[in-house]
A protein has these predicted regions:
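Beta-strand-rich interaction surfaces with strong enrichment in secreted/lumenal proteins
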Residues: 40-46, 58-60, 95
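Calcium-regulated, polybasic anionic-phospholipid
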Residues: 4-50, 78
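Exposed aromatic-hydrophobic patches
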Residues: 50-62, 92
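Extracellular and analogous surface-interaction loops
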Residues: 1-3, 60-63
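C2-type phospholipid-binding modules
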Residues: 16-25, 65-118
Length: 118
């Protein structure tokens, strides 16, 4: 088990103005990845402005594993048999986002659109 100093709490609050998907309904969810660890929000049904208010703990030794960023992917949950659709991703640079243990940052991050979502 990782030491308490090796934990990173990631809170995904919301998104706004997400791309509509083919068929018109968007069922977005977010996946936060840091190194090999990840956490995921629940699916917000039929909205392009989801409110997740979701927290996850990621246990990773940032220095030991040479981890310097979190990747946040926003996906559309495809309710049919097809694969989920990537709506875009944001990269959070931990070198500038984390000032010291116990400090929270509250920022909006723009999604870089996934290929084919123009």
């Amino acid at each position: 088990m990782a030491d308490i100093s090796d934990r990173l709490e990631v809170k995904v609050v919301s998104a706004r103005s997400l791309s509509e998907v083919e068929g018109g309904e968007c069922n977005p969810f977010a996946v936060a990845r840091c190194g090999s660890e990840f956490g995921q929000t629940l699916v917000a049904n039929r909205t392009t402005d989801p409110e997740w208010q979701s927290s996850t703990m990621i246990f990773v030794d940032i220095a030991e594993n040479d981890v310097d960023h979190i990747v946040l992917n926003v996906m559309h949950k495809n309710l049919s048999a097809q694969a989920d659709v990537d709506l875009g991703a944001a990269i959070v640079d931990l070198r500038t986002a984390i000032l010291s243990p116990g400090i929270e940052t509250d920022e909006w991050y723009a999604l870089q659109r996934a290929p084919g979502m123009d």
